[in-house]
Amino acid sequence: MIKAEILAPAGSFEALTAAVRSGADAVYFGTGNFNARRNASNFSGDDLQRAVDFCHERNVKVHITLNTLVKDSEMSELKESVRRICKSGADALILQDLGVLRVVKDICPDIELHASTQMSVGTLDGIRTLADLGFSRAVLPRELSKDEIKYLCENSPIELEMFVHGALCMCVSGQCLLSAFLGSRSGNRGLCAQPCRLPFAAENGTGHDLSLKDLSLIEYAPILSKTGISSFKIEGRMKRPEYVAAAVTALKNSLSGEYSSENSEDLCSLFSRSGFTKGYYENALGRNMFGFREKENVTSATASLLKKYERIYEKERAVYRVHFVLSVKSDKKISLTASANDLSVTILSESLPQKAVNRPFTKEEALLRLKKCGGTVFSFGDADICICLLYTSDAADDK
């Protein structure tokens, strides 16, 4: 069984750092004006390249969102954005507009294509159509039940990705016009004002009767992985880095069988709307799915809790185990080779080694120095060391 991907949101470089150092396999973020979270910090220009390089140096993939509807008058800007993304070396594009799909195929034909949840494709026929169009992955709607997800996984010709934690819209993603009608800020243009979180009342309701609790299916990740989900997505490009770190940590723990009530409590404290819901997944629709941000939800993230997750991502995480080969011979330049995965680098000294004057340079000392990888993406694996020149002085030769 292929290991399922942990896909984390990155609305800022600090959030991206939190995702990567907490153990995400991939991150997703927007660039420019053509993504569903235009109010996030996002990445553009040099920041885009810096973000992609940061991730790739740590063996983390980058999925970039171009998941809004684009006007004809914006085609020049769109093409420039696609060229910039293609040049950056990003791994995949998440798309909504089929017109954007055509532009991407013309400019960057080799990049992987993912169908955004904004496309509202939740049927097998729809997924097969996406495959025919060239998509290699579809992001499933949040509104599907576990039986529907299982059926799609068993029959889909392409990879399937699903949200396992984060906000739920009152409407199906990609189909809502409420924000556009009430304030001329369209969700399909990346500018949703979230009017469903405002006080709308129905008879015998809560006073916030369009506001759903956040989804949380992290505890079901092992089951969903066996079902065939390829990627578990965390919503939250507008959330703080500590939230990202906590969600990635919880998901990682779940997939390794170490998920606990502490993970759930931490997530609820960092952000919730009166708790979480599994309503759609369990096909248990009803009033318990609704909730809003009450005062205790806003103030529950204590300084100690924030610091707990800040500590996780403030230090560099070792990704590569390095094998060293060191050769010190009297008639050759010193050679040091470092190998990790499929990469190998060899450096040579500028001159031949000189005999030690005060003390010998031993294998033990060389090993001690090679093990100093702290604060980098590397960790010491093992070493083959050959040192033939050990004597401190001529006097040592006489002993």
Where are these regions (language model features)?
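Residues at the C-termini of beta-strands that transition into short coil/loop
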Residues: T117
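Surface-exposed amphipathic alpha-helical tracts and adjacent flexible/coil segments at the periphery
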Residues: M1-S22, A26-R37, A51-V52, R58-C86, ...
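Aromatic- and glycine-enriched glycan-recognition loops and surfaces
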Residues: A40-Q49
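Beta/alpha (TIM)-barrel catalytic core signal, keyed to glycine-rich beta->alpha loops juxtaposed to Asp/Glu
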Residues: S120
